[in-house]
Structure formats: C-alpha cells, structure tokens
C-alpha cells in the first residue's frame, strides 16, 4: 500500500443517496507513531451522509487517544443541486502547516492549528498516511439505514489522483 507525507489528494465521485449510507475518502497513518486512534491522527478529505445529499464534511482528528481526542472541521453545502446527481471533485492540499479542502475546484475550508499529546506541532500530521475509500452502511456518523434506502448502493469513483512536488 502506498503512503504519503504532504501533497494534493483528489477524487472524482458520484455519491449515493439514502439514509444510513456513509461514503468517505480519508487517510490514516501508516504507523501509530503517537498512539492509538485518534492520537496518531485521521484526515477526512470527504465524508457524506446519504440523507443530507447537498452537504459533505472535511475533518481532522488528533490530540489524545479516543475518547479524549479532538476533531475539527466543518460541513460544506453545495450552492445548487446535490452530490448524488453527478460527479464532483473532492480534494485536499496538505502541507506541513496547513490543510485546504476543495470541492469542484473551490476552496471550502482551511485549517492551520492542531495539536498532539505525543509531540510538537505539526504532530501528528508529520508522518506518512495512506488513503481509504469506503462506503459504510449504518454507523455513528451515517446513522441507521432508512426503510426507503435502496440497495445495491453505489459509491461511483471516476478517479483518484495524488500529486506531490
């Protein structure tokens, strides 16, 4: 499995509608250098709740191990239409001292402050991370499956790109 320290991570995808569907494009550390989740960090490039089709989330998880961890991020609401009606491009630019999230080429969030119980800034985001793409069904973030959620559900991915300087 490939892993990276810094870069631009991009995916073009069409997201599935339905209560309880939870597609995500995210990153975990290759090693738990600072301890168990989330002390070693997690980078959520895009998370989606199938029952909120016009909104995606980008979040950093860090600090101490769960349940004393910190998470910081915000949702982005599409100005017109929703994320289930066609392909959209989700991207993250990760530098030593900043994270920037993009949707369809528009910057929607920036974070420059985080901390770690295990080391000085920029820990825990000073180590290599690998990519994860998944479609969860149910769970704490996605919520329970709705009686009208249609299966099979598809998280359609056109491409994933990783760019580095």
Residue ranges and their predicted role:
Residues 1-165:
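GH16 jelly-roll
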């Amino acid at each position: 499995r490939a892993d990276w320290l810094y870069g631009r991570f991009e995916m073009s995808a069409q997201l599935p509608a339905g209560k309880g569907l939870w597609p995500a494009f995210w990153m975990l550390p290759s090693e738990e250098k600072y301890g168990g989740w989330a002390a070693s960090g997690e980078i959520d490039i895009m998370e989606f709740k199938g029952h909120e089709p016009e909104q995606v989330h980008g979040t950093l998880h860090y600090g101490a191990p769960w349940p004393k961890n910190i998470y910081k991020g915000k949702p982005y609401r599409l100005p017109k239409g929703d994320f289930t009606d066609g392909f959209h491009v989700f991207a993250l630019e990760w530098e030593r001292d900043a994270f920037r999230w993009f949707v369809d080429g528009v910057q929607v969030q920036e974070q420059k402050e985080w901390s770690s119980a295990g080391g000085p800034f920029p820990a825990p985001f000073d180590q290599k991370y690998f990519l994860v793409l998944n479609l969860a069904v149910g769970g704490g973030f996605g919520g329970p499956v709705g009686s009208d959620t249609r299966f099979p559900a598809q998280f359609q991915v056109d491409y994933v790109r990783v760019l580095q300087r």
